[in-house]
């Protein structure tokens, strides 16, 4: 995949070349999207809109730390939707990992989560965030046990993941109406990178065959159900709903 690769570390140690080789990235000086290695982290920038800033994965500080410490925990909608109850903490495959936010919330309340991400740039961002998270004194121990990244297309990986998870979680990209600054910024940069999720409807059936208990699909409240398959079961929040479908028991 072609993208502009920029090294701002000043280290001169060739780390960016190693990273590019690992993820199959090819430097393209004219590309509007840039993957930038800074002294702190790896980030994605839209070069023609510098005001948007860089997008990076941070499980240790910022919004994710706040959500972990002060968020709803088991009371969060995504936790309710996957069926967390009492001692039951399902094994989850997040087949549309994105920046890993929902996967992290589930891991922080005790679920084991395998994140699937097919885009090599997004996978590189996730991997960078995980490496920093794993090294953190406060969260590193449980994060290594509970949150993993698999770089693969969900459409193919969902048929051969073992062991089977109890829950498959899907949050396909859907055009956002909200004008919240964060969503707007991220979605603009993200959609410039990966384009629309045109094959998302094809994920529901393999997800239902893989999950032993349920499939959870996050949708904006104005979006039709995935693959136009309606379900009466959903956890509804302000602005979103988590549609719940039966999986395929062992």
From Swiss-Prot:
Keywords (A to Z) from UniProt: Cytoplasm, Methyltransferase, rRNA processing, S-adenosyl-L-methionine, Transferase
Keyword Ribonucleoprotein: no
Major localization class: cytoplasm
Molecular function GO labels: rRNA (guanine-N2-)-methyltransferase activity
Gene3D superfamilies: Vaccinia Virus protein VP39 (3.40.50.150), YhiQ-like domain (3.40.1630.10)
Compartment(s): Cytoplasm
Single GO cellular component term: cytoplasm
Source species, domain of life: Bacteria
UniProt xrefs under InterPro entries: 16SrRNA_methylTrfase_J, SAM-dependent_MTases_sf
Residues engaged in binding S-adenosyl-L-methionine: 101-102, 117-118, 153-154, 171
Enzyme Commission number(s): 2.1.1.242
Keyword Oxidoreductase in record: no
Family matches, as HAMAP family: 16SrRNA_methyltr_J (MF_01523)
Function recorded in the entry: Specifically methylates the guanosine in position 1516 of 16S rRNA.
Family: Belongs to the methyltransferase superfamily. RsmJ family.
Annotated PANTHER family: RIBOSOMAL RNA SMALL SUBUNIT METHYLTRANSFERASE J
Protein name according to UniProt: Ribosomal RNA small subunit methyltransferase J
Species per Swiss-Prot/TrEMBL record: Shigella flexneri
Organism ancestry: Bacteria, Pseudomonadati, Pseudomonadota, Gammaproteobacteria, Enterobacterales
């Amino acid at each position: 995949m072609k993208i502009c690769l920029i090294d701002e570390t000043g280290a001169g140690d060739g780390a960016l070349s190693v990273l590019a080789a690992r993820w199959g990235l090819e430097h393209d000086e004219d590309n509007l999207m840039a993957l930038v290695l800074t002294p702190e982290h790896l980030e994605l920038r839209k070069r023609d809109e510098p005001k948007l800033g860089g997008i990076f994965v941070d499980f240790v500080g910022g919004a994710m730390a706040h959500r972990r410490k002060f968020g709803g925990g088991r009371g969060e909608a995504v936790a309710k939707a996957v069926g967390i109850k009492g001692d039951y903490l399902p094994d989850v495959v997040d087949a549309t990992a994105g920046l890993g936010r929902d996967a992290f919330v589930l891991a922080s309340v005790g679920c084991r989560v395998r994140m699937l991400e097919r885009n090599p740039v997004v996978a590189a961002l996730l991997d960078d965030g995980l490496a920093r998270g794993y090294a953190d004194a406060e969260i590193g121990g449980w994060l290594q046990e509970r949150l993993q990244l698999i770089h693969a297309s969900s459409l193919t990986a969902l048929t051969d993941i073992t062991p089977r998870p109890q829950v498959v979680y899907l949050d396909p990209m859907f055009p956002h109406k909200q004008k919240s600054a964060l969503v707007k910024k991220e979605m603009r940069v993200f959609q410039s990178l990966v384009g629309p999720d045109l094959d998302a409807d094809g994920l529901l059936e393999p997800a239902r065959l893989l999950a032993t208990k349920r499939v959870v699909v996050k949708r904006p409240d104005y979006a039709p159900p995935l693959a136009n398959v309606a379900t009466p079961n959903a956890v509804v929040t302000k602005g979103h709903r988590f549609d719940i479908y039966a999986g395929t028991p062992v």
